[in-house]
């Protein structure tokens, strides 16, 4: 036990362990989940944490690979305004109609489609070119349980929001709508029919903040211990026979405390 403590203190293994944990935490693919209903707008991210002058890039893919410098094209880039100029927002490529809007550190999807649920990645780049670690967001859709028709029962309309077929679009009809008038094939599992907001995103953000606070507390404790030389004093107390510290003459010494 004493040899293990001596090895840890002499080689600063605890400090390297803390640094390694911080690096793994930053590179981990922990995405903030946001659920939304099809057809509604949604905003990813928040305005907090944006520093003036930062250029913010948004990608509709996972952050893995983007942090490694792979050649990827953003779907939206917020270019901060220069003195005397208006704000600029660029989308790549420019869609028609406009699908995304980005401002500061947020991305707004103006109309959520069934193809939108996926991972989105945000990367902030200050003017000096040293971009921050990317942040991952997951957009998902949720749905309610649909009801089915049983023999002898009246037809129950599905509560699943669907898209009419081409022959029923732009037509007004007074007859009762039947589920046969809708095309429900090809819709992905998990089609949305309710909106829960950004509760999951806030929970993930709170968990990330808690982890960082814990790491900072551990670092502060380690600094205090080494400032008051507590590990060295404990090592001297346990090393009653002078195995760990010996002077040039081979006898136990306490010069390391001076």
Curated annotation (Swiss-Prot):
The lineage of its organism: Viruses, Duplodnaviria, Heunggongvirae, Peploviricota, Herviviricetes. It is a single-pass membrane protein. One of its GO terms (cellular component) is membrane. Its main location: membrane. Residues 167-177 have a biased composition (Basic residues). It is found in: Membrane. This is Uncharacterized protein UL10. It comes from Human cytomegalovirus (strain AD169). Residues 147-156 have a biased composition (Low complexity). Residues 157-166 have a biased composition (Polar residues). Belongs to the RL11 family. The chain crosses the membrane at residues 208-228. It comes from the Viruses. The gene is UL10. Residues 147-183 are annotated as: Disordered. Glycans are attached at residues 60, 104, 113, 183. Keywords: Glycoprotein, Membrane, Transmembrane, Transmembrane helix.
């Amino acid at each position: 036990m004493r040899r293990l403590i001596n090895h840890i203190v002499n080689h600063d293994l605890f400090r390297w362990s803390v640094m390694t944990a911080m690096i793994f935490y930053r590179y981990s693919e922990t995405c903030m989940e946001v659920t939304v209903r099809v057809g509604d707008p949604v905003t990813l991210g928040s305005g907090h944490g944006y520093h003036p002058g930062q250029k913010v890039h948004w990608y509709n893919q996972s952050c893995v690979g983007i942090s490694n410098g792979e050649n990827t094209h953003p779907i939206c880039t917020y270019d901060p305004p220069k003195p005397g100029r208006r704000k600029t927002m660029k989308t790549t490529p420019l869609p028609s109609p406009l699908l995304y809007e980005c401002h500061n550190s947020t991305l707004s999807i103006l109309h959520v489609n069934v193809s939108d649920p996926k991972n989105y990645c945000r990367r902030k780049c200050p003017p000096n070119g040293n971009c921050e670690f990317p942040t991952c967001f997951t957009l998902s859709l949720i749905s309610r349980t649909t009801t089915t028709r049983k023999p002898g029962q009246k037809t129950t309309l599905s509560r699943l929001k669907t898209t009419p077929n081409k022959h029923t679009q732009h037509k007004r009809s007074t007859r009762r709508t039947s589920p046969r008038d809708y095309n429900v094939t090809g819709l992905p599992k998990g089609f949305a029919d309710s909106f829960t907001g950004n509760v999951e995103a806030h929970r993930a953000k709170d968990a990330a903040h808690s982890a960082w606070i814990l790491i900072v507390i551990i670092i502060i404790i380690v600094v205090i211990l080494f400032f008051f030389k507590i590990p060295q004093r404990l090592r001297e107390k346990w090393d009653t026979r002078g195995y760990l510290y010996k002077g040039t003459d081979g006898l136990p010494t306490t010069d390391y405390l001076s």
